[in-house]
Amino acid sequence: MALASSNATSMEELFGNPFRPKKERVVVEEKPFEYTPSAYVQMIDQMIGIKTRPWNPERTPIKPIQMLTLPEMSREERWIQWGMENCTVKASISGVLGVGVGFAFGLFTASVDPQLSMVGGDPTKQLTLKQTWKEMSSRMKSYGKNFGSIGLMFSGTECALETIRAKSDWRNGTYSGGIVGGLLGLRAGIMPAVWGAAGFAVFSTIIDHYMRG
């Protein structure tokens, strides 16, 4: 339209009345073109472009709208997840729980038959409160130490095997039971170590199969 107007004016100047006063031209200034990128272009430039981002001088990242996803984990939740995945933490927790189970088991057996491990005592006489407490404490310490060491060794070995193999299946429990049983039986000799490894491996496999089933 502007081109047609300019052509008409030029034709009038050429072939019009030369004595007629000339009309003043109205010059309309054109605004400079300003490019405003869309949200899609901004996202593409942020991901794979040159990342100039003149519309975002603070360089704040674009966060997608979460619709069907879980919210971000807090700092405390990340710490808990790290602790549950760390072999040292898992082994320590299993050891502490094993000590607690050993204490309870020792207390139960001592309350059922407190004279079971009394050596050199008269079984016909009734035990005093001091003797009963001594028997209970010694048995609780013994069971707690055994159960705690077994839980610590088994959980640590299983976590290490799971990390090395990068798999979480029943073989981790079987291998861990064999290793821990062999180490515990090795104190009595080679054959007890073999039988201990085999028995503990079978027991771990059965328990793992029951828990996973």
Swiss-Prot record:
Q: What is its main location?
A: mitochondrion
* Its membrane topology: Multi-pass membrane protein
Task: Give a single Pfam family match.
Answer: Tim17
Which GO terms of the cellular component aspect does the record hold?
TIM22 mitochondrial import inner membrane insertion complex
Keyword Coiled coil annotated: no
Gene Ontology biological process terms in this record: protein insertion into mitochondrial inner membrane
Instruction: Please name the InterPro entries in this protein's record.
Output: TIM22
What parts of the sequence cross the membrane?
Answer: 92-112, 143-161, 188-208
Give one GO molecular function term: protein transmembrane transporter activity
Localization, UniProt: Mitochondrion inner membrane
Entry similarity comment: Belongs to the Tim17/Tim22/Tim23 family.
Known role:
Essential core component of the TIM22 complex, a complex that mediates the import and insertion of multi-pass transmembrane proteins into the mitochondrial inner membrane. In the TIM22 complex, it constitutes the voltage-activated and signal-gated channel. Forms a twin-pore translocase that uses the membrane potential as external driving force in 2 voltage-dependent steps.
Specify the protein name.
Answer: Mitochondrial import inner membrane translocase subunit tim-22
Q: Which organism is it from?
A: Caenorhabditis elegans
